[in-house]
Amino acid sequence: PAVRVETVEPVGAVGGGSAPAGRRVGSVALVGAGPGDPELITVRGRRLLAEADVVVADRLVPRLLLDELRPEVELVDATKIPHGPAATQEEINRVLVERALAGATVVRLKGGDPYVFGRGGEELLACAEAGIPVTVVPGVSSPIAAPAAAGIPVTHRGVAHEFTVVSGHLPPDHPDSLVDWAALARLRGTLVVLMGLTNLPSIVAALLAYGRDPDTPAAVVQEGTTGAQRVLRSTLATVAADARSA
């Protein structure tokens, strides 16, 4: 198995930096691991994993991809569990920069796509400020893949000509929420809510209050594209209660 570093050390935010004299600067690749099934990583993403000296991985990354790393690879666990112990983004940025400045080929492996609720943009900026070359490898994103695996097309001729992806991490009435739920309720297309199970009752209440049809078909997909996938089909009016009793 790869060399495993269970957590990153708590240090300050990354600023600039430079490689030691006479040592080449390494590189960082922000790689999307896909929605859960390890076979859904891109060909390029898998190749970069095979070439990496250091892999910094999140909780949502398929374990099989990590088990296949070369024995000498340093695996840094950047687990970010919602509402629990977490490596701060500044710590993760610091590890990426530090390892690359030491000459390593670093892969930042993230569930789904690096730029879809993955803070890939913040990591790109941290590396750019330190003068480190960055490659971005898009990943198959769960807002499309999970519905597809459940047999639900996000667009369908004559039914949905658009789909919208939003975070459900914050409830609709939270002061930090940037989501316009009133506007979403007026749309006719498919609405995909990520990280929304905890706040599902308040999300449903907001959409209904703003006029979304209570008979709108609704589904909850858990562990999409994996062997543990579960799908609940319902309507907007009843999905919160159905999910609670499932």
Annotated model-derived regions:
Residues 1-38, 43-140, 145, 240:
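Class I S-adenosyl-L-methionine
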Residues 73-80, 131-135, 154-164, 211-220:
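Short hydrophobic/aromatic-enriched beta-strand-loop microsegments
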Residues 32-33, 52, 57, 84, ...:
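Short, functionally important structural connectors and interaction interfaces within domains
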Residues 1-28, 101-106, 162, 167-246:
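A contiguous loop/helix-start segment that scaffolds small-molecule binding in enzyme catalytic cores
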Residues 43-48, 69-73, 122-127, 151-152, ...:
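Short, solvent-exposed amphipathic alpha-helical segments in soluble enzyme
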Residues 75-81, 92, 153, 172-173, ...:
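Alpha-helix boundary/capping detector
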Residues 111-187, 230-233:
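Class I SAM-dependent methyltransferase SAM-binding "motif I" and its flanking Rossmann-like core
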Residues 69-70, 89-90, 147-151, 167-169, ...:
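Short secondary-structure transition/capping segments
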